[in-house]
Structures are given as C-alpha cells and as structure tokens.
Regions:
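A generic local secondary-structure boundary/capping motif
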Residues: 27, 64, 144, 154-157
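Flexible glycine-/small-residue-enriched beta->alpha junction loops
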Residues: 79-84, 152-155, 159-165
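Ligand-binding beta-strand-loop-alpha-helix segment within the catalytic cores
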Residues: 158-188
Length: 195
C-alpha cells in the first residue's frame, strides 16, 4: 500500500514554520507514515537550511506526481514568498502575511484537486496576516472558505500517536462558544474525528 502524500505548507517565513517543516521532512518517522512535500518558497527554506546547517537538497516540482521521495532530497512545490530582505526571522510583519495564506491555499488546493491525500499547515503568525491587511480568523475558517465548505462543518484536529482532539468551536469568546455547542455540533465533530 502506498503511503499518503501530504502537502506541508511551511507557515510564516519569519516564524518557526519553516524550521518545523524542515524537521518534519527530514524525520524518518514522518517518512515511515507518509510521503511529505513542502509547499512554500525554496528561497525561504534555503535561508533556514543554511542557518540550521542541515544537510539536504531542495528539488522544485510542479506537481506531487513528479515527486521521487529520495533520501536527503526535499521536494518543494514553489509558491513565491516575500523577498528575503523584507523580513527578519523572529519578527512578524506584513511582508509575510500574504505568503502564509498563499502557501496554505496552494496546499489546500492540491488536496481539493485530489493531488495529495492531506494537508499540514505549519504555524502562522496572526499578527503578520493582520499587518498585511488581511481579514483572518484562523486556518479552519480559511480552509472552509477556500473549499466552499460551511464554516460550521470545519474542525481543527490536534493529533498524536495515541490521542486525537477535535475542537467543537474555534477563535470565539466563551459565551459564543457555549451558545454554539449542541448535540448536533458535537456529533459532527466526532464524525470528522472518525474519518
């Protein structure tokens, strides 16, 4: 059986997302479960590869079916990021806001088109997105709008080897959350968890 192909959006170019993405694709445990492809800027990834002194090579591909998944080679579907001189690692800013959603949107589109089996979105910095003038309520709402799914039918899952946690509400105040939670919503969250 072929392992699933997972598109990993690299997150905030100025944040920890690219580091996490690189650590994931270089981890043998990840490769034992899936075939990862990064979605983002090769230039940004090269910046972090050099800073972290990682021994790997990037290979840009146009589509997931061109991936070879060879050891030490990280396949990247290129999505332009901000110019390297427009941001500093560790400092959120408007230059990175658009890139965060461009990377994630491209990964979600690959899944929607059936070209990958799943998407992982590395950490984003909401401050960067808002500083870029973008109205943003979190990844789940973004994914819902990108896929034409009603926002009430999208859930965020935290997943480990032994535990799955699905939030029934996201990014709202406690009073609004309590008003939204009902049996139907809990059942929808459970069904999403069981997929």
């Amino acid at each position: 059986m072929n392992k699933p192909v997972i598109a990993i959006a690299i997150g905030d170019p100025a944040g920890i997302g690219p580091e996490i993405a690189l650590a994931a694709v270089l981890d043998e445990g990840v490769h034992s479960r899936c075939r990862p492809i990064l979605v983002g800027s090769t230039e940004v990834l090269e910046l972090y590869r050099a800073q972290l002194k990682l021994s790997c090579t990037f290979r840009e591909i146009l589509a997931p079916d061109a991936a070879e998944f060879a050891p030490g080679i990280i396949e990247v579907i290129e999505v332009n990021g901000p110019p390297l001189d427009s941001f500093s690692p560790g400092k959120s800013g408007s230059a990175c806001g658009k890139a965060i959603l461009d990377y994630t949107g491209a990964a979600v589109d690959l899944a929607r088109e059936g070209k990958v089996d799943g998407v992982v979105a590395c950490p984003h910095t909401q401050q960067s997105i808002v500083a870029g003038g973008i109205d943003f309520d979190g990844y789940p709402g973004f994914v819902a709008r990108r896929t034409g799914t009603h926002v009430n039918n999208v859930f965020m899952m935290l997943y480990t080897d032994t535990l799955r946690i699905v939030h029934t509400t996201l990014h709202i105040g406690i009073r609004a959350a309590l008003e939204l939670i009902d049996i139907d919503r809990v059942v929808r969250a459970l069904r999403a968890t069981d997929r």
